[in-house]
């Protein structure tokens, strides 16, 4: 969905800022939601790093009524497990 794509892009942007990285968002592969004083989104996404496509998992916490959005976690998915 558009909302999930936006959250995935947000996750990549935040990761890039924090890590001084240059990941380019590709596409959302999978997503799960959990309700926790807002919503926790677990987004599996593809991003490109220096021309190499990899899969990452992002955890984004959203509280829309507070206009709050925070990247909780961002990590590469081990190719062996996918």
UniProtKB/Swiss-Prot annotation:
Q: Sorted alphabetically, which keywords does the UniProt record give?
A: Protease inhibitor, Thiol protease inhibitor
**Any Pfam family:** SQAPI
Q: Which GO terms describe its molecular function?
A: cysteine-type endopeptidase inhibitor activity
Q: Which SUPFAM superfamilies match?
A: Cystatin/monellin
Q: Which InterPro entries match?
A: Cystatin (IPR027214), Cystatin_dom (IPR000010), Cystatin_sf (IPR046350), Prot_inh_cystat_CS (IPR018073)
Task: Give the superkingdom in one word.
Answer: Eukaryota
Cystine pairings recorded for this chain: none
Q: What does this protein do?
A: Strong inhibitor of papain and ficin but poor inhibitor of cathepsin H, B and L.
Q: Which family does it belong to?
A: Belongs to the cystatin family.
Name used for this protein in its record: Cysteine proteinase inhibitor A
């Amino acid at each position: 969905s558009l909302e999930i794509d936006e959250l995935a892009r947000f996750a990549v942007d935040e990761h890039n800022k924090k890590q001084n990285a240059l990941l380019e968002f590709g596409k959302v592969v999978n997503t799960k939601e959990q309700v926790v004083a807002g919503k926790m989104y677990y987004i599996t996404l593809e991003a490109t790093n220096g021309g190499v496509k990899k899969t990452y998992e992002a955890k984004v916490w959203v509280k829309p009524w507070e206009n709050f959005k925070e990247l909780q976690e961002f990590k590469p998915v081990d190719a062996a497990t996918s």
